[in-house]
Amino acid sequence: MMFPIRCFSCGNVIAEVFEEYKERILKGENPKDVLDDLGIKKYCCRRMFISYRIGEDGREIIDEIIAHDERYL
């Protein structure tokens, strides 16, 4: 699944800050502090970031799905 453009619950646009969130998380910053700095205050929006899987190498789950599909074509 790709990162959603909007929060599933409230509809706020959240994708505009995802790349910065991802970069800072990969640098080792605390997700709580990053979300606070980015202005993501609502818990429904915060859970969209926290629950989205980003591997230690920066790969997202969609990258793994695509690689899996290509092996079996």
Curated annotation (Swiss-Prot):
Transmembrane segments: none annotated. Its cofactor is Zn(2+). The keyword ATP-binding does not apply. Binds 1 zinc ion. Zn(2+) binds at residues 7, 10, 44-45. Its EC number is 2.7.7.6. It is found in: Cytoplasm. Its main location: cytoplasm. GO terms for molecular function: DNA binding; DNA-directed RNA polymerase activity; zinc ion binding. It comes from the Archaea. PROSITE patterns: RNA_POL_N_8KD. GO terms for biological process: DNA-templated transcription. GO terms for cellular component: cytoplasm; DNA-directed RNA polymerase complex. It is an enzyme of class 2 (transferase). It catalyses: RNA(n) + a ribonucleoside 5'-triphosphate = RNA(n+1) + diphosphate. Keywords: Cytoplasm, DNA-directed RNA polymerase, Metal-binding, Nucleotidyltransferase, Transcription, Transferase, Zinc. Part of the RNA polymerase complex. Forms an Rpo3-Rpo10-Rpo11-Rpo12 complex upon coexpression. DNA-dependent RNA polymerase (RNAP) catalyzes the transcription of DNA into RNA using the four ribonucleoside triphosphates as substrates. NCBIfam families: PRK04016.1. Belongs to the archaeal Rpo10/eukaryotic RPB10 RNA polymerase subunit family. This is DNA-directed RNA polymerase subunit Rpo10. It comes from Methanocaldococcus jannaschii (strain ATCC 43067 / DSM 2661 / JAL-1 / JCM 10045 / NBRC 100440) (Methanococcus jannaschii). The gene is rpo10.
